[in-house]
């Protein structure tokens, strides 16, 4: 099918008001928007990198024994990659309006770049809800079946990793086979796609995935809280940190789900639509908030990340392979 007559995705049709860059936006104002976001995205990327170094290398013998932290590593990798993409590509395309034309020409003339960049971005967005499900189920199983929690997750972990890597392809296959192109908004552009299979919309797929995740998260969280109220104080103390961290990460995730729902159900969009602003901000809250939540929740991880050498025996210890951390 000729590209000029190929059916565009609904989002692309609604967003593609002009096939060229909009020069009416002030480059200075748009550049300042990038600078504001750069101020919090760069420290977030550095924090993610530091956490991954701690978990995967410096203290791997401690953290890799814990199924929760293995799942959290996958979350960190996804968030870190998305933040780096935003710093160097997505936000540059959107807010460096003075370079909009040469950058959009690069995207069109070198299709290998969007063919890698956009599917990877969407793969990671799909992987995040799956990781969220696994994190909440992990915490629930820890309080429901504490006597065999470690053994169950040790056996299941290889399947969990495969699930996170492979399941997103069930949602992004249409993106992979479709043509990627610049979609012009706010004086810049983002990368969209022309759907080869009309009914297979990424918005619909993500909405279904987010809805499933919210239901599972709500059920698992309710069971976890109910079970924690019936456990002994010693066990509650040992599990409280990771459970609270999981709850807070779930809150960040729910904000993203709400923003994506607004974007999906908003029938009429304009170039000044608030949904185009809320969606990336909600992603930022999730990607930036996740490492902050874990560092704030776990005093042990906080000491390791920031290199604080002083150690409190009553506040941090290892018992039977379980990391026990206080606030």
Swiss-Prot record:
It comes from the Eukaryota. Its main location: membrane. It is a multi-pass membrane protein. The chain crosses the membrane at residues 35-55, 70-90, 157-177, 181-203, 244-264, 277-297. Pfam families: Srg. GO terms for biological process: sensory perception of chemical stimulus. It is found in: Membrane. One of its GO terms (molecular function) is transmembrane signaling receptor activity. GO terms for cellular component: membrane. Keywords: Membrane, Transmembrane, Transmembrane helix. Belongs to the nematode receptor-like protein srg family. This is Serpentine receptor class gamma-2. It comes from Caenorhabditis elegans.
